[in-house]
């Protein structure tokens, strides 16, 4: 029985899963968090949950602990490849690829497009090359699914020479999730290919219009900063705000502004909390800024859904996924309430239960589908080896 090790490496965390790509069974899942701090913890979930602590544990320490776990539990001998989630593949990658010196250099070349993500992915790949040298590795790109977005949507209305010399265009993100969820929606609807709008709402948020199974538009742009309001990211703003802040009036540097827009904005910037569960609790207690954050968040989602309706002669479904999309019934309700004029109506009982279909009888289909990026990465990896 072959197994695929799936890795999602962040700046201070590593999420991992061991998956049988043929049966879709998840054999082991786990998370290492707070890497390189005194609170570094690694959690393994298989038949039992195991927690281990690595005070000031490094990335390398985490990978060595992971290898020890795989050896002790007789998994390493069954692993045939490692699949890595990579947020940004730029113009270089329209599909998943085997990792070699050339592809790794191209991933490095995309660091400026995903400065919060790609450096950590590269570090994870390098440690795997050291610790699992015999295993082939595959990069599965969040941007690949969006390579079908037509040029009149992907291009920005700035000087053409500039955009093409420096590969400035809409690349999107969360493509692995959008692809998986749109395919699952098609299966549930018993269609070969579906026409759906997928709203991936979590700490990072994006919306994609999928026509005949292909991405035709998506809310994230050159980088994962564009589009919806997110946990700590601003989403789309007037570009002149950047120039205003950097002016002599305020004197911020480009680095400071970029950090602010990526790490100090969104829900966190509005009300001081980036977790929608905490924001919702505060709003329920009457906190005015938490209420404002929810309204701004919900309005932005509804606005994108409304704008994407132009792509469909017949919409098969609006699909919610991601941590917020799958679990926050109050947020789904708030979003749908703003779309009543377009034929979206919610069944409050079904919504409260997070059923697969949460729409009322005379509405467009509204669905809740759990994403499974790890399984999609495992299957893409299996197909390449």
Curated annotation (Swiss-Prot):
Tell me the Gene Ontology biological-process terms attached to this UniProt entry: acetate metabolic process; acetyl-CoA biosynthetic process
Q: Where in the cell is it found?
A: Cytoplasm
User: Which PROSITE patterns does the record associate with it?
Assistant: ACETATE_KINASE_1, ACETATE_KINASE_2
Which keywords does UniProt give here? ATP-binding, Cytoplasm, Kinase, Magnesium, Metal-binding, Nucleotide-binding, Transferase
Marked site positions, Transition state stabilizer: 174, 233
What this protein catalyses is:
acetate + ATP = acetyl phosphate + ADP
Presence of keyword Cytoplasm:
yes
Question: What positions belong to coiled-coil segments?
Answer: none
Q: In which pathway does it act?
A: Metabolic intermediate biosynthesis; acetyl-CoA biosynthesis; acetyl-CoA from acetate: step 1/2
EC number, as in UniProt: 2.7.2.1
The reply on keyword Cell membrane is no
Q: What class of enzyme is it?
A: transferase
Subunit-level organization? Homodimer.
This chain belongs to the protein called: Acetate kinase
- Write down the species: Francisella tularensis subsp. holarctica (strain OSU18)
* The gene coding this protein: ackA
């Amino acid at each position: 029985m072959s197994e695929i090790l799936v890795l999602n490496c962040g700046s201070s965390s590593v999420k991992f899963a061991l998956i049988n790509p043929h049966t879709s069974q998840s054999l082991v899942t786990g998370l290492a968090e707070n890497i390189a701090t005194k609170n570094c913890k690694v959690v393994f979930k298989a038949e039992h949950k195991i927690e281990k602590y690595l005070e000031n544990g490094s990335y390398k320490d985490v990978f060595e602990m992971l290898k020890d776990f795989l050896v002790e539990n007789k998994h390493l001998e069954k692993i045939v490849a490692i699949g890595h989630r990579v947020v940004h593949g730029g113009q270089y990658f329209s599909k998943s690829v085997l990792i070699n010196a050339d592809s790794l250099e191209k991933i490095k070349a995309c660091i400026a497009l995903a400065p919060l993500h790609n450096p950590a992915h590269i570090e994870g790949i390098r440690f795997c090359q050291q610790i699992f040298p015999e295993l082939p590795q595959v990069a599965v790109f969040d941007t690949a699914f969006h390579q079908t977005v037509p040029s009149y949507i992907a291009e920005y209305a700035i000087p053409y020479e500039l955009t093409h010399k420096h590969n400035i265009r809409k690349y999107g993100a969360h493509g692995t999730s959008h692809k998986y969820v749109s395919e699952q929606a098609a299966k549930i609807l018993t269609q070969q290919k579906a026409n759906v709008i997928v709203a991936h709402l979590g700490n990072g948020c994006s919306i994609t219009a999928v026509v005949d199974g292909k991405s035709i538009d998506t809310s994230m742009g050159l980088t994962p900063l564009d589009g919806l309001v997110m946990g700590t990211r601003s989403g789309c703003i007037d570009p002149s705000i950047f120039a205003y802040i950097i002016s002599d009036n305020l004197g911020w540097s480009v680095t400071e502004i970029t950090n602010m827009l990526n790490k100090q904005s969104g829900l966190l910037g509005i009300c001081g909390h980036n977790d929608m569960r905490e924001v919702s609790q505060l709003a329920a207690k009457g906190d005015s800024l938490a209420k404002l954050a929810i309204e701004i968040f919900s309005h932005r989602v509804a606005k994108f859904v409304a704008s994407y309706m132009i792509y469909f002669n017949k919409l098969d479904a609006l699909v919610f996924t991601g941590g917020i999309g799958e679990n926050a019934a109050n947020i789904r309700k708030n979003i749908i309430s703003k779309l009543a004029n377009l034929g979206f109506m919610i069944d409050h009982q079904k919504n409260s239960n997070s059923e697969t279909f949460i729409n009322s009888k005379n509405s467009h289909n509204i669905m809740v589908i759990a994403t499974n990026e790890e399984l999609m990465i495992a299957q893409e990896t299996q197909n390449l080896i």
